Amino acid sequence: MLTLRKMGFAVATAMLLAACNQGGGAPENKTASAPAGASGEATAPAAGGELVVKLGTANPLTGAFAEWGKDAANGVKLAVDEANAENLTWNGQKVKFELMSEDDMADPKTAAQVADRFVDAKVSAVIGHLVTGASLPASIVYNDHNIPMVAYSVTGPKFTQQGFKGVFRVISNDKQQGDALGAYAVKTLGAKTFAVIHDKTAYGEGLANDFATAAEAAGAKKVATEFTSTSATEFGAIVTAMKGAAPDLIFYGGMDPQGAPLLKELRKQGVKAKYMGADGLKTSNFPTLAGDAAEGAFASTASVADDKMPGRTAFAEKYKKAFGGEVVAYSPYAYDATNVVLAAMKKAQSSDPAKYLPELAASQFDGITGKIGFTENGDLKDGVVTIYTIKGGKWEVAQ
């Protein structure tokens, strides 16, 4: 689930997608109506007769993922500031958007507590959270209180398989990544045998399983499965197992703090199998961590490549002007997620989910990351997966 500058800080990447899990079960259809029992306007009058519309955004603002979370929060803030600059009126009343930003620490329990605070504050919508593990418990709270939620980086399939009418995402999911990588490994890279290694997180295991299913469907044979953890620093036993299995390709489900040194050790011990991961490895730090061993590695993102984003350059300029720094990762997606909510509210002339949720579900929004529309479950329609390889120490688009 990582893209753009791709987060060049190792400690953060250690856990970011640990909760992006593989969901199961048939999803219920999403209907273009508000959840049963939706309340009225979650707003408050302000001085001068303004209608104050409260929006919530939850991101890790402290801890290992703070740089990603702050970047995403900036994207939300930029969209809200621009909306306020429009001096909108709904039904003759001036509207002011008020952003409530909370730190969920990318932690499920904290995220649920944040969700409760948003409920108490009567927010009209939530943009976030960063990871699936935090988003799942929070989404239950929002669904119970009829608050729509649009995620900008959540890739775990289960997120949109809960049957919730007010849950959406503006990025592809992990199953799409696993499917694309599995097919690419066999059909393009020619792998006849493969091994999977994962970090035992919902994210890593889910991706590894999806990759394996797709690779086997394409005709390859799995010859080994091994496990590590998000805190591992020693990989000797795994390397020994890989030497014995001798696969054509190794898929790693996890993040770069383990994925990179694992690759380095594999190469040091003479394992020449092609090496592949998903967005947990597609970071600017991976080539540095893996050194020369990184050359020829493959990874993916659940999004379009930077140069394919229609509004990437203009957004980066606005972002730098507003915040004095470069785009880190998900701020363009957070910006789009916010704007698709605002567009639905504007069209409905209301912040009441009963009125704007049908517009949100039917969105056909031209965002800076591309066209945004939603399936009945709330997934992004026509989601894109981009596959990269490292050449000369740098990530390049492979497909």
What would you call each of these model-derived segments?
Residues 16-19:
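C-terminal motif of bacterial Sec signal peptides marking the signal peptidase cleavage site
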Residues 5-12:
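Sec-dependent signal peptide hydrophobic core
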Residues 2-5, 21-399:
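Extracytosolic ligand-binding ectodomains
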